[in-house]
C-alpha cells in the first residue's frame, strides 16, 4: 500500500455518506456533496460539487444535524439518498446524467425518518423505519396519496431590467392519468402565486372485441405523454414557476416546461 495522491482543501464530514457509484465515489463535505470521479479520471480537474443547486439548503440542515447521517446508492433506482434525521428530511440525488453545470437533479422526501437502508439485487430497495420495514416502489405512500411539488428558482431570462409578460406555458409530462395538477407562477420574488389547474384523462387500453381463445387483444398500453397548454397573465422582471400535484397511484414526471413570453421596457 502506498500514497499515490492527496486532495487538499476538502474532507469528508460524515463517514456513512461515502458511497461508491460504479466509476465514481460520492461523499459529504463542508462544501456540499462531492464527486471524486472527475478527479480520478483527469487529475488536473477539481472535485465536482454535485449538490451546487441545493448546496445552501443542504449545508444549513447538515449544520443543525445532531444525529448520525446515513446514505445509500441504489443502482436499480439510480439515486443516492442522504438522510438528515433531525430535520426529518431525506435528500434524493438522481445520478443517471448530470445537468449541464455538472450537478445532479435533487429533490427531498419529507415526513419519513429512515434508520437504515438496504438495496437487494433482484428483490428491491428497503428502508428500516421505527414502525417496521418499508419497501420502495409504486406511486402511493402505503395506501395513501402524497403531494408532489416543483418550483424553479427566480428566472430573469438573462436580463433583470426587462419586463416579462407571460402568455402561455407548454408542458410535457409523462403519466398523470386521471390526475389534476396546478401550475403556479409569480413575479418579482412574491410567494403569492397565481394558479391555474389542468388535468388529464385516465389512460385506456385499446381493445378490439375478444380474441378467439378467450383472451383480450391489447393494442396500446404503458405511460402516456401529455402536453397540456396553460394560458397565464401578469408581468414582472423576475419570474418563479411551479407545478404541484397529488400523486395517486400513477406516475407523474415533468419532462419539460416551455414558457412563451413577451418582453417590454420600464418607462
Set out the residue ranges of the language-model regions.
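A short beta-strand motif characteristic of beta-propeller blades
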Residues: 2-7
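Beta-sheet repeat architectures centered on beta-propellers
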Residues: 9-15, 19-24, 30-267
Amino acid at each position: 500500500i502506498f500514497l499515490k495522491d492527496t486532495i487538499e482543501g476538502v474532507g469528508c464530514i460524515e463517514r456513512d455518506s461515502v458511497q461508491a457509484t460504479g466509476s465514481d465515489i460520492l461523499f459529504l463535505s463542508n462544501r456540499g456533496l462531492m464527486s471524486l470521479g472527475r478527479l480520478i479520471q483527469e487529475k488536473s480537474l477539481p472535485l465536482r460539487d454535485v449538490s451546487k443547486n441545493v448546496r445552501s439548503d443542504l449545508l444549513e440542515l447538515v449544520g443543525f444535524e445532531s444525529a448520525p447521517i446515513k446514505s445509500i446508492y441504489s443502482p436499480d433506482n439510480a439515486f443516492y439518498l442522504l438522510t438528515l434525521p433531525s430535520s426529518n428530511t431525506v435528500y434524493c440525488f438522481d445520478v443517471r446524467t448530470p445537468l449541464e453545470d455538472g450537478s445532479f437533479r435533487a429533490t427531498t422526501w419529507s415526513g419519513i425518518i429512515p434508520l437504515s437502508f438496504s438495496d437487494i439485487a433482484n428483490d428491491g430497495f428497503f428502508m428500516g423505519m421505527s414502525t417496521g420495514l418499508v419497501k420502495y416502489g409504486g406511486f402511493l405512500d402505503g395506501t395513501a396519496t402524497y403531494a408532489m411539488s416543483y418550483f424553479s428558482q427566480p428566472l430573469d431570462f438573462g436580463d433583470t431590467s426587462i419586463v416579462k409578460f407571460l402568455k402561455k406555458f407548454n408542458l410535457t409530462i409523462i403519466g398523470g392519468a386521471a390526475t389534476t395538477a396546478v401550475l403556479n407562477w409569480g413575479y418579482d420574488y412574491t410567494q403569492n402565486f397565481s394558479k391555474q389547474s389542468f388535468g388529464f384523462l385516465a389512460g385506456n387500453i385499446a381493445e378490439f372485441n375478444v380474441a378467439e381463445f378467450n383472451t383480450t387483444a391489447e393494442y396500446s398500453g404503458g405511460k402516456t405523454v401529455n402536453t397540456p397548454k396553460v394560458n397565464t397573465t401578469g408581468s414582472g422582471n423576475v419570474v418563479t414557476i411551479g407545478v404541484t400535484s397529488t400523486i395517486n397511484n400513477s406516475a407523474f414526471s415533468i419532462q419539460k416546461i416551455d414558457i412563451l413570453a413577451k418582453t417590454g421596457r420600464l418607462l
